[in-house]
Amino acid sequence: IDLPDGSMIRLTIARYYTPSGRSIQKPYDSTVDYNKDLIERFNHGELMNADSIHFPDSLKVQTKKLGRTVYGGGGIMPDYFVPIDTTLYTDYHRNLVAKGAVIKFTMQFIEGHRKELANKYKKFESFDEKFVVDDDMLANLKEIGEKEGVKFNEEQYQKSLPLIKTQLKALIARDLWDMNEYFRVMNTTNESIQKALEILNSDEYQKKLK
């Protein structure tokens, strides 16, 4: 399937295995059980705290070469655990998104500044480095939110402010360029992505491959 950004998705029913023979997929014989498992893991705190994840000893296996402890049972426990950060997500932010205030603001802003943005930022790298979501833009967003029935909450607004700024910048980048640029902006606040990049560029990771 060809996608608008030039990438492609390939659907398959095949299973994928790591070099040590572990399937990266969980068993999904039952759709209900598969979805229920994710909900139970979230409620149990497994996505927020590594200490909440427990494996029975029967699933533990030592790799022959490096002697690392890995686990069977379907799916993979990562070598590095990055907890989900839920502090940025508030009801106020969710309502701004759900009521369409974020998209409406973005569309209005771009239509009012398209020529200016195109002339000022010829390349995404320049936009990424220099463009800043300022106070006037945020005030406009709050105003649109009020008109859409989203009651302003100062405490929740301050908590979600870093996410709101990143999201607005990413949506503007998407309109000016494409989805690749959208994710390049959004991923700056994605702790899993940032941790992965840190590890992949470290000597410690290279040692694990030997």
Which stretches of residues belong to each language-model region?
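Conserved phosphate-handling catalytic cores of large alpha/beta enzymes
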Residues: I1-D33
